[in-house]
């Protein structure tokens, strides 16, 4: 007859075996060496690594690059024809963009619109100026 302590030891040893098997599986996949990635697998891996930043297929170069230089090697050359690791994939990620401040509609005033000048026909302006002159001259005469 099997006692409860014997059952516990049998159960524990089987759990220990499965635990060791899981650990070996996860550690071997986590420490796996570089692998080759081509086509959709390469794009999926770049999207996973780079996220929202996006990525380049060729390494970004400076503005002064000329076409006379040696042809560039891209991610396909490095990861499809040869094997590459995670660090190599990260080199092709686009740089982070600075976060834009969120603008609230409530924060904007309704008076932010530029004020337009009131339009007055030119004839009205001349009449008003002449009336002012007359008033000014009559005022001076009464003094």
Curated annotation (Swiss-Prot):
<dbReference type="GO" id="GO:0043410">
    <property type="term" value="P:positive regulation of MAPK cascade"/>
</dbReference>
<dbReference type="InterPro" id="IPR022350">
    <property type="entry name" value="Insulin-like_growth_factor"/>
</dbReference>
<feature type="region of interest" description="C">
    <location>
        <begin position="62"/>
        <end position="73"/>
    </location>
</feature>
<dbReference type="GO" id="GO:0005179">
    <property type="term" value="F:hormone activity"/>
</dbReference>
<dbReference type="GO" id="GO:0008083">
    <property type="term" value="F:growth factor activity"/>
</dbReference>
<dbReference type="InterPro" id="IPR036438">
    <property type="entry name" value="Insulin-like_sf"/>
</dbReference>
<keyword id="KW-1015">Disulfide bond</keyword>
<feature type="region of interest" description="B">
    <location>
        <begin position="33"/>
        <end position="61"/>
    </location>
</feature>
<protein>
    <recommendedName>
        <fullName>Insulin-like growth factor 1</fullName>
    </recommendedName>
</protein>
<dbReference type="Pfam" id="PF00049">
    <property type="entry name" value="Insulin"/>
</dbReference>
<dbReference type="GO" id="GO:0034392">
    <property type="term" value="P:negative regulation of smooth muscle cell apoptotic process"/>
</dbReference>
<dbReference type="GO" id="GO:0046326">
    <property type="term" value="P:positive regulation of D-glucose import"/>
</dbReference>
<dbReference type="GO" id="GO:0051897">
    <property type="term" value="P:positive regulation of phosphatidylinositol 3-kinase/protein kinase B signal transduction"/>
</dbReference>
<comment type="similarity">
    <text>Belongs to the insulin family.</text>
</comment>
<keyword id="KW-0339">Growth factor</keyword>
<keyword id="KW-0964">Secreted</keyword>
<feature type="disulfide bond">
    <location>
        <begin position="50"/>
        <end position="93"/>
    </location>
</feature>
<feature type="disulfide bond">
    <location>
        <begin position="38"/>
        <end position="80"/>
    </location>
</feature>
<dbReference type="GO" id="GO:0048009">
    <property type="term" value="P:insulin-like growth factor receptor signaling pathway"/>
</dbReference>
<feature type="propeptide" description="E peptide">
    <location>
        <begin position="103"/>
        <end position="143"/>
    </location>
</feature>
<dbReference type="InterPro" id="IPR022352">
    <property type="entry name" value="Insulin_family"/>
</dbReference>
<dbReference type="GO" id="GO:0035867">
    <property type="term" value="C:alphav-beta3 integrin-IGF-1-IGF1R complex"/>
</dbReference>
<dbReference type="GO" id="GO:0008283">
    <property type="term" value="P:cell population proliferation"/>
</dbReference>
<dbReference type="InterPro" id="IPR022353">
    <property type="entry name" value="Insulin_CS"/>
</dbReference>
<feature type="region of interest" description="A">
    <location>
        <begin position="74"/>
        <end position="94"/>
    </location>
</feature>
<dbReference type="GO" id="GO:0005615">
    <property type="term" value="C:extracellular space"/>
</dbReference>
<dbReference type="GO" id="GO:0008284">
    <property type="term" value="P:positive regulation of cell population proliferation"/>
</dbReference>
<keyword id="KW-0732">Signal</keyword>
<feature type="compositionally biased region" description="Basic residues">
    <location>
        <begin position="126"/>
        <end position="136"/>
    </location>
</feature>
<dbReference type="GO" id="GO:0090201">
    <property type="term" value="P:negative regulation of release of cytochrome c from mitochondria"/>
</dbReference>
<dbReference type="GO" id="GO:0070382">
    <property type="term" value="C:exocytic vesicle"/>
</dbReference>
<feature type="disulfide bond">
    <location>
        <begin position="79"/>
        <end position="84"/>
    </location>
</feature>
<feature type="region of interest" description="D">
    <location>
        <begin position="95"/>
        <end position="102"/>
    </location>
</feature>
<comment type="function">
    <text>The insulin-like growth factors, isolated from plasma, are structurally and functionally related to insulin but have a much higher growth-promoting activity. May be a physiological regulator of [1-14C]-2-deoxy-D-glucose (2DG) transport and glycogen synthesis in osteoblasts. Stimulates glucose transport in bone-derived osteoblastic (PyMS) cells and is effective at much lower concentrations than insulin, not only regarding glycogen and DNA synthesis but also with regard to enhancing glucose uptake. May play a role in synapse maturation.</text>
</comment>
<dbReference type="InterPro" id="IPR022341">
    <property type="entry name" value="IGF-I"/>
</dbReference>
<dbReference type="GO" id="GO:0043066">
    <property type="term" value="P:negative regulation of apoptotic process"/>
</dbReference>
<dbReference type="InterPro" id="IPR016179">
    <property type="entry name" value="Insulin-like"/>
</dbReference>
<feature type="region of interest" description="Disordered">
    <location>
        <begin position="99"/>
        <end position="143"/>
    </location>
</feature>
<feature type="signal peptide">
    <location>
        <begin position="1"/>
        <end position="32"/>
    </location>
</feature>
<comment type="subunit">
    <text>Forms a ternary complex with IGFR1 and ITGAV:ITGB3. Forms a ternary complex with IGFR1 and ITGA6:ITGB4. Forms a ternary complex with IGFBP3 and ALS.</text>
</comment>
<dbReference type="GO" id="GO:0045725">
    <property type="term" value="P:positive regulation of glycogen biosynthetic process"/>
</dbReference>
<dbReference type="GO" id="GO:0005159">
    <property type="term" value="F:insulin-like growth factor receptor binding"/>
</dbReference>
